[in-house]
Amino acid sequence: MERSKKLKEAILQRTDEIEEDGYHQAILNIMYEHWQENAGSYKDTIEWYKNEYGELAQFAVLIGKYNQQVTNGGHLQYYDNGYADEKSGFGGHHDPDIPLHQILTVLFSQSGLRDMTSTAVFNILQEFRIALDTTEFLEEDQYDEEGNHYLDRVNNDDYGEVINTQYLSKLDKAYYEICDEFMKILEQYFKEKITGDKK
């Protein structure tokens, strides 16, 4: 409860930001400022934000980054840039178990957002998964100088790459159809949480 009160006080001091960009963005801005000043990992920053301001702040950031990444480059970008796991940053090896995304899904389920649009978004969040190519080596047909056939074992250039991109594209399309409406719902949700005003 104390952390929730601290978040409310911090946000209500940002009247210019609220007027220009809204309550949700004001919540995100606190995290961004800390992240830039401390240059820690995304995971560490999210953990700091939760410890400092509570789960509402954590939910605001996780759902905000999800929306930004998916609307910018789809669910594949969300994964590739590391916002679904604990290793932010493009490239590298990201965790296909997407632990931060799993936290987002749990927080969403506890949020009380039950309207039709939010329920559709929650379903998309639950359906998001990553499948990687786990075949490290391939066998290729080869022939020796005398024409005898043999199989040669070669490296698979796609080893570790995401292979369910068509599935992810379907999730992208489903989200794009409702994301604008969902952002309006989220803004009202965070406004109510900060101010208590249901109008």
Segments predicted by a language model, with ranges:
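Long, low-complexity intrinsically disordered regions enriched in Ser/Thr, Asp/Glu, Pro/Gly
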Residues: 6-7
